Each structure stands twice: as C-alpha cells, then as structure tokens.
Amino acid sequence: VPLAYLFAYALHRTLIPFKSLWRGISLLPLLAPSMLPGIALVYLFGNQGLLRSLLTESIYGYWGLVLGEVIYTFPHALMILLSALSMSDARLFDAASSLGASSWRTFRSVTWSSSRHGIFAALCLVFTLTITDFGIPVVVGGDYQVLALEAYKAVLGQQQFGRGALIGMLLLLPALLTFGVDVWLRKRQRDAMSSRAQFYLPKANFQRDTLYLIFVMLICALFLLVFGTAVYSSFIQFWPYNLSFSLRHYNFEGLPGGWLAYTNSIILAFYTATIGCFLIFMGAYLIEKTASHSWLNNLLRMLSFVPMAVPGLVLGLGYVFFFNLPNNPLNFLYGSMVLLVLCSIAHFFTTAYMTASTALRQLDKEFEAASLSLKAPLYRHFWRITIPLCLPALLDIYRYLFVSAMTTVSAAIFLYSPDTILAAVAVLNMDDAGNIGGAAAMSTLILTTSAGVSILLSIASQGVLRRTQAWHQREAKQ
C-alpha cells in the first residue's frame, strides 16, 4: 500500500511525463491470473533462475509469497488510491501557502487527511486479497502454510468438505471485519469536494518530479521484468539450458485443460460480461431511479455490497454445498458453464454495481422531468437518454467483468468439470504437474486476450464519450 500510495501521488500530484503509460503498465497484474507473478518469480529467482545469485534465501517460502502478493495486489490498491487522490480542492492548498505552511505540513493537513480513508480501504482490500489468494502460494509458497491453500487441499486433495468449510469460515471472518470497519469509516468521511471547489493542478518542481519519475520508472521496470520474463519463457525450448525459440509450450494436446480450457474461459468471460452487464445495470437503474419503496431500495443497496465482503474461495465453497446436494432440483447445474457464469456474476457484482450506480446518479433529474412533461414512455427515455449517456460506464463494466472472468480461479476452482475447465485453472494444474512452461504459455494467452479486449473497449469507450459529450462542448463554446 505505501508503494501504491507513492505511485498514485506521482500520477496526481506531480508533473511527471507519460502518466498514461506508467498507469497502464502498473495495471498489468489485473489482466493475468494471480499465478503469473509466481511463475515469473520462479524463472527469475528459482533454483535455475536468471537472478538467483541476487537472493540469499530461496524464493520458495515466506519472501516469495510477500514479493508475489505485492505484485498481485499493487494495482488493486493503486486504483483505490488514485480515486482518493483525484479529488482535491485547490483553495485548501492556496490557503496553506498563504499561511506559510511547509510542504510537509500541507501534505499532512490537506493531502493526508483527505486520502486516509482511501488508504485504509486499500489496506482492507489488500489484506482480504492476500489471505484468500492461493494462486501464488501454490507456485512459490513452498512449505509455508496459508489458509487458502489448506482449504484448496482439504476439498480437492483430501475430499474433506467439512474441514474446507471450516477454513472457509476462518477466511470469511477477517474479510467481514475489515469490510465492516471500512463501511463505518466511509460513513464518517466528509466530502473532499464541494460544489464550489476548484480543481487542483500541481506546480512544477524539478527536484520533486525527477525523484518521483525515477520511482515510477523503477516500479514499472519491475512489472515489465516480471511479466516480460513470463511471456519470454513461454517461447523458450527448455529453460535455462536451451533458450532457442519454440512454440512447443503452446501445444496443449495431451495436457490437462489446453485449448479447451482457453476456449471455455473466453465463453465464460463473454457470457459473464454480456449477461452480467445487462442484469447489473438494470438492477442499478431500478434501485437508483425508483422513488417508491425507499426501504426496499435501501435494503437492496445494502445487499449489493455483500459479495465484496465474501472471498471468492468461500463463495465457491458455498456453491458446492448448495448445488452438489443430490436432493437439490438444481443439482444438474453443478459443473456446468451456467453455474460458472452465475458464480462469476455474483463474485464481481459489487464493483460493477457501484460503477453503474455512480453513472446513474450523475444524470440530472431534469431528464426524467422533461420526459414526463413530453409524455414520453419510460422505455423510450431509457433507450434514447439513459443508455447513451451511460454507455461509457456500461463499456467499463463489460471490460471489468470480461477481464475478471478470464483471470478468476478462486471462485471457480471447486465448480468446474472436465468439460468446463478454465484457462486459469489449467495454469494451476499445469504448475502442479511440473509443466511450468505450459503454465506460462496459458498465462500469456490470458494476458494477451485480456489486454486486447481492454484496449478495444477503451477505444470504443473514448469514441462513445466524445459523441455523447459533444453537447457539453457545444454548450461550453456558447
């Protein structure tokens, strides 16, 4: 979290060049399964690693877990901190400067006070992600025992579902505790921006900007080294003895998963993004734009935050106990793609809902008033006004659901069948079988697919934003 805070501060409070480039590189771990940083660390610092001599201890164990989880959780914390540091009132900085406050005093009184709730939210998220992740512990954990890996071994390795459920509850308790504290702090947080606030623009400072640029470049260089090594290793004949170019790791025939797993992941991501985007946006619209039954809206709004507090591993265990019951009429769904889609939508519901809800709240109520005065039916207003204005947010939701479904492993690890195995699960199985080259190749496919879809949707979102916001620009010119 401290590294992510400094990175976010550099992007928002300095004048370093190429901010979009640094931000894009820092978000790379979001596009790959959590096992990929672990695989890259093995190639870099493992027994046959390129940089093995730089470490005095083995990468397999505590320090491997720490380094892998830092890389994996960094972009998650960064996104929260970027949001926390994006809103600042320039009048507060002007007042501090007029009173002769030092840079440190201004930072402590203005910047820190307005962003400390975001820091705690990032701490809660990183804590929850770390204790519930078992992708990195599987790859570089060694003999170091973690709860998530024990739950995985209990259910799949030993068929001890009761023990797995107990460990799942232990994982749920700290996640619920941190989530509850975060909600309580959010209620006490004051608005950082008022209606009269002025947008803050940092002033040029060569020494400060140079130091932060060096820091940002070092972080991005680390990410490029890690992910570049993983991608490079997937095209190597036999690491580290034969470094000639080869595509043999992409020949997944005869291996658990293979191209079927990759195809299944694309199908899962497509249906999760398409169906989830529609259901979540419609649900957010009914909650935010329905005036009647406010108590019901508040209840539904509160329930929409529940998936954020439930780790994916616990959610997957719950689906196993419910859908795997022989007397359950829905038992036929167990192991099917339908159940994987439902679980993925539920798992990633909260973030997508918050995006849709924020977009809908930004729409002026005068739009509805104008439609009512013109006696336009609700569906026409929804299709002609709401959808076009919220289309950039819809594309962001679609991108988030697609990428998350492509990289998910925790919620789906207990729910797949041989016919519905996913690419991220195949990475896990290949690594367990000792085929780390195949695991790197599959991770590379996931990374490139997620990056390609994200770039296409980002371009589409910018184009839609220019068209839908053109009336704002004309109004400003007038």
Where in this protein do the model-derived segments appear?
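Transmembrane alpha-helical segments of polytopic membrane transport and secretion proteins
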Residues: D182-M217, W295-N297, I459-Q478
